[in-house]
Design a protein with these regions (language model features):
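Extended alpha-helical, oligomerization-prone segments that build pores/tubes and scaffolds
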Residues: 1-341
Length: 341
């Protein structure tokens, strides 16, 4: 349903990507020009402009700043700044950000995704950042927040080959035959232009291996749920603590805590807090469920020309008519020169 809602945006965004790649004419437009003796040449001003924008925005690595709320927090602020720089460094953040800026300028929407790599540092795990192809991300169409904070959910689609899914999810090898193979289409939309620049985009590569490699679609759905927490106030010493459900169950089984509760010296208040739940499925098979200890979606959209919806416009969409005019003028000039020769 969410894919159908953004079908028109897919067409416009793919058209903008084609303009960046130098494919400005559809097959019908190219044939019509040749029928009247005009060439379908392209005087490409879009590519250079986008590359210049990317160069300006990503010429230097970002610098982080953390400020303590009080003077005693200065050391902790330095620790957080160092951690953020470390995460950026191990994630190859410059490359990830450059690709997100590229999607921002061409398709109109870039995405950065924060995740935990459980295999990093010999199993200790690391927090990392990567970019996401905007065509793989499906946002609730009802969202009206620039960063999709009010969305009921975000879906991340990943199409994997058999070898890839076994490598990423070793537990599915035993049930691989139960998973539905996926041959319908790529998340990446097909082009409506003539591929004059011989560009190999995901939709064309997908067709080249169609029916030769088994593929599976993984859907990771991020939703907001309410999770209970417990605020424990000790009237005896004035201390207060916040416990999740697991820690709370252990707390109420503690003999000393039970004595304090019986004496009325412990005040317990249950509060609901928003958290992000991740559910990953492959067809009808549940791969995993996880509740993230945050109320912010780990997928962060970077919209270009904001339209009040999850479907922004790109810089290219604003200059396509000017580029078409330039191409047409050159075609007419060349045709006139040939006729006058």
């Amino acid at each position: 349903m969410w894919k159908d809602a953004r079908a028109d945006w897919d067409v416009e965004a793919r058209d903008a990507v084609d303009f960046f790649l130098g494919n400005h004419y559809s097959q019908e437009e190219s044939d019509a020009l040749r029928a009247v003796g005009q060439a379908d040449f392209v005087i490409d001003r879009v590519y250079a402009a986008i590359e210049k924008l990317k160069s300006l925005l990503t010429s230097r690595s970002p610098k982080y700043s953390a400020v303590g709320r009080e003077d005693s927090d200065s050391r902790m602020a330095n620790v957080w700044r160092t951690l953020l720089e470390y995460v950026w460094d191990i994630s190859d953040g410059d490359t990830q950000f450059k690709q997100a800026v590229h999607d921002y300028a061409t398709a109109g929407m870039g995405y950065l995704y924060t995740y935990i790599d459980p295999e990093a540092d010999y199993g200790r795990g690391e927090v990392k950042i990567t970019y996401l192809d905007p065509f793989r991300v499906y946002v609730d169409p009802a969202s009206r927040n620039r960063y999709a904070d009010d969305a009921s959910g975000i879906i991340l689609s990943t199409i994997l080959t058999e070898d890839q899914i076994i490598n990423m999810y070793p537990q599915v090898e035993a049930i691989l035959e139960d998973l539905d193979t996926y041959y319908d289409e790529e998340d990446y939309p097909s082009s409506g232009k003539r591929n004059s620049s011989a560009s190999f985009t995901p939709d064309t590569v997908y067709e080249s291996e169609y029916n030769r490699v088994s593929k599976y679609r993984i859907l990771e759905r991020f939703t907001k749920i309410k999770v209970p927490f417990y605020r424990i106030f000790n009237k005896q010493d004035g201390s207060e603590s916040i416990l999740d459900t697991e820690k709370y169950e252990k707390f109420v089984q503690n003999e000393q805590a039970q004595l304090l509760m019986t004496a009325g010296l412990i005040e317990i208040v249950e509060v609901k807090q928003t958290r992000i739940k991740v559910t990953a499925t492959a067809g009808d098979v549940l791969l995993y469920e996880q509740i993230l200890n945050t109320d912010i979606y780990p997928i962060v959209p970077i919209p270009n020309i904001w339209t009040g919806t999850p479907y922004p416009k790109s810089d290219i969409s604003k200059v396509k008519d000017s580029q078409r005019l330039l191409n047409k003028l050159f075609s007419l000039t060349l045709s006139h020169a040939q006729a006058s020769a």
